[in-house]
């Protein structure tokens, strides 16, 4: 699978692959990428999103395999750092479990793992809801109506990309993404990955997501969980300065910003 990917930065610099969330495609990472010119940044549109829309349907295993193929084909060293947000962080976890040798260090924010006893029932229910035409219209209106409802400020130069993402994600294929994300459980083999990994959540996120970060960190020998003080789920996009400093600190093994704290 050949994903569309934006690329910037020096070819010889450490490579970082950015995996976007579930409502916006890869262009949404631009404010973060602009703050990290010292890295070679690869920003794919995941299957069924943006310019990789025709690579759908979205399935977690297929998405991780496509990212692995991207790293093998575009990164000469054969390894890359991985940064993920929300849906992209789930893909990052899957990649750590299935292709650990491809990942150097990772920063994964807002990762949701289904720990409920009846995973399939959850998938069926949410899939049914997301296939409902009324739900799609409500979602489309919600994403388009008020600037405050958007997951992050949308630059005027990116309005066309934003509207196209909304159009695609509110199509019938939305159910594929919802089902894959809702059914994501701890993948087999995650404990064998020794990639240093930071699982981070906004301190204002739901407690269940913070518990997911703690559980994921427990599965890996070199992982930790932290919280971004005063931040919500979308903080990687709404505060790109803090997020880019967090990523740079983790990737270089230096101190994290003071806003990144131990969970209480």
Model-derived features: positions:
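Gly/Ala-rich beta-loop-alpha elbow adjacent to hydrolase catalytic centers
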Residues: 84-88, 92
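Conserved alpha/beta-hydrolase "acid-adjacent" motif
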Residues: 206-212
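Flexible "cap/lid" loop of the alpha/beta hydrolase fold
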Residues: 97-98, 104-134
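Short beta-strand/loop motif that positions the catalytic acidic residue
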Residues: 193, 199-201
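Catalytic histidine-centered segment of alpha/beta-hydrolase-like enzymes
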Residues: 231-240, 244
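Conserved HGGG/HGGXW glycine-rich cap/lid loop of the alpha/beta-hydrolase fold
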Residues: 4-53
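Active-site loop/oxyanion-hole signature of alpha/beta-hydrolase fold enzymes
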Residues: 42-83, 245
